[in-house]
């Protein structure tokens, strides 16, 4: 409950209907998954799928209103591994996952814990979906002590959850949760080296990098 201050420093005994709420939340989740694996000579293939359903029930005892949301979540995954001669391996993986909004993000509340920065929930938020791709290569020559590796990972998000901000002439910022496209993250890594037995020394180098893009509205 939120109460407004009076001119004499006391607080009004009547709740501020814009900022007040009394919520009861119930969350129910059920999950299931399956996978298929196939091995043939130097190849290993795996395909799987998981699914879950999450149900939200939000009852505002202050306004005597009830909101319900149901999210169906899918978790596809696949991998391909090819083992070459010696200790060389090539691995390609994909996984997908939905992510439902949190209670704070979908509840239609106006939060005034910080009077200059007001956060508003969005009951119409969609769940986001992440596509995760990765490619890895590893090689090690036991006799010569030479090793090398490289990899890249890329995550792309559909209907990502972000914020839309607006600022009033008085300097108050209002932030509302919204869905956006165009969010992604990518990183890469690699290295190589060898062991010099007669010097009891290992020489090598490594490199890595990353790029991240996250959209919001102002």
Q: Where do the protein language model's features map onto the residues?
A:
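Exposed, low-structure sequence patches enriched in small/polar residues
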Residues: 1-218
């Amino acid at each position: 409950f939120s109460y407004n201050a009076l001119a004499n420093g006391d607080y009004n005994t009547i709740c501020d209907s814009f900022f007040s709420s009394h919520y009861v939340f119930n969350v129910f989740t059920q999950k299931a998954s399956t996978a298929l694996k196939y091995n043939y000579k130097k190849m290993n293939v795996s395909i799987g799928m998981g699914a879950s359903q999450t149900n939200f029930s939000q009852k505002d005892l202050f306004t005597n209103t009830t909101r319900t949301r149901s999210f169906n979540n899918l978790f596809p995954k696949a991998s391909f591994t090819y083992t070459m001669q010696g200790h060389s391996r090539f691995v390609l993986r994909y996984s997908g996952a939905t992510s439902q909004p949190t209670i704070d993000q979908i509840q239609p509340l106006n939060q005034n814990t910080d009077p200059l920065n007001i956060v508003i929930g969005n009951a119409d938020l969609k769940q986001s979906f992440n596509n995760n791709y990765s490619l890895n290569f590893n090689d090690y020559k036991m006799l010569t002590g030479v090793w090398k590796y490289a990899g890249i990972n890329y995550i792309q998000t559909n209907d990502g959850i972000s914020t839309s901000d607006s600022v009033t002439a008085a300097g108050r910022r209002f932030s509302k949760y919204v869905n956006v496209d165009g969010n992604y993250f990518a990183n890469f890594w690699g290295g190589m080296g060898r062991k010099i037995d007669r010097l009891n020394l290992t020489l090598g180098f490594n490199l890595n990098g990353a790029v991240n893009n996250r959209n919001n509205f102002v």
